[in-house]
Amino acid sequence: MDRRLGFHYFQDINHYQSRDLALWLPELKALNAGWMVLKSPATMAIPEEFIASLVSQGINPIIDFDLQVNTQVRPEELRVILAAYAKWGVKYVVFFRSPNTKAAWVDGTWSNGDLVERFLDRYVPFMRMAEQNGLVSVFPPLQPGGDYWDLSFLKKLFQLVQQRRSLDFGSNLHMAVSAQTFSRPLSWGAGGPLQWKMPRPYTKNEIGEEDHIGINTWEWYHHLVKSTLNITPKLFLFWFGASSIYQNTLDPSLTFDSLYEQFNSARDNRAADSILGCLFWVLASPSGDPRENTSWFDDQGKPKQPSIAAYKEKLEHTRKQEVEYPVAGKVAEWMYPIDHYLLLPSYEWGVPENTLDRVRPILRDSRPTIGFSLIEALNARKVTVWNENAAFSEKDIDMLRQ
């Protein structure tokens, strides 16, 4: 099953104890989460037990240092912490806050000129330090719009990268991208500049036009990267489902289930293959914290929306239906003309209408050969049996195991 769903964890550093693991790990497993953004101080590492426990369950931590761009912290000061994180199984780090916002810069330094170039000069040494420790530095999420228009910021940044020919910035470009809705429809801005006119900074959209300031910001960034650097970036959708992280609001019209379906529908877009993770904002916050209004769970682990429980039930049902049986290895691998076969049930009256809809995640992730023939399935190296309503008997399954 798909493991690209994830969460932003508590926005403090006080929930990394054994009791927190005991509370949240079962929930994350039940939701089939594959990613977790964790806030980290620059002076000490998150406990190894917490990191290692997530990794052992297939949950990839993304370490977020949340540094102001021109803080006094130097890359060398993070060497030991980064080495520890890499040793414990971490692969991705984010160093800075949204650099196109004034809040990301030390007071009095925002208007010093050459903002984008100053950021790039600051960012590259941290990126190199991450690489030296076997980690990938994820480009920080820009605020759509922002105090410095985000699309202009990116375009200027990529122009600088091209000018500095020795800077191998784009070969392994990973970006965090805002997926805030700003209370706009989930379809807002879908298709990016291939569908809509490029918006002018800080001006009202023309009648009938849509811009990038919504949940589909990633499509606009993806196009900008491809058109300027001619590479395909790897993307993490940050703050997914928040109306605005700065106003601490969730869109009341959205449910967990509808947001997940939005993510699934976006994946029908070929560009969505570049999305590594979809990080919901926010898993939980302490009682009384302003972000409590935007959390999906309370601080005791109780879901705030019935749709979360319904989603978990749907996942559990899928787990029971989707059973993979590796074909017996008595014959050399090259003897199997089919690599992966998805065996679907059929009945005298036909095929259930919703079967193909329900197996779409398997089709997207594995691209198997699809069929209804047990005999044909015997020619595959691996068979996934969609055993809905016990359509296949134990005798059928045993044939595949032999």
Where are these regions (language model features)?
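Acidic (Asp/Glu)-rich catalytic clusters
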Residues: M1-D2, A22-L31, M44-I62, V80-V90, ...
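Boundary/entry segment of secreted carbohydrate-active catalytic domains
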Residues: M1-T43, E324-T369
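Aromatic-rich peripheral "rim/lid" segments of glycoside hydrolase catalytic domains that contact
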Residues: R4-E27, Q247-V331, D398-R401
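Acidic-and-aromatic substrate-binding clefts and catalytic sites of carbohydrate-active enzymes
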Residues: Y9-L21, G34-E49, L67-E77, N100-A103, ...
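Alpha-helical scaffolding within the catalytic cores
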Residues: S18-W24, T43-A52, V73-A83, Y148-L167, ...
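Aromatic- and acid-rich polysaccharide-binding/catalytic face
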Residues: L38, I63-F65, R97, F139-Q143, ...
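Substrate-binding cleft of extracellular glycoside hydrolase catalytic domains
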Residues: P41-T43, E49-F153, A391, I397-Q402
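Catalytic-core region of carbohydrate-active enzymes that cleave or remodel glycosidic bonds
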Residues: G58, A84, D121-R128, G214-S274
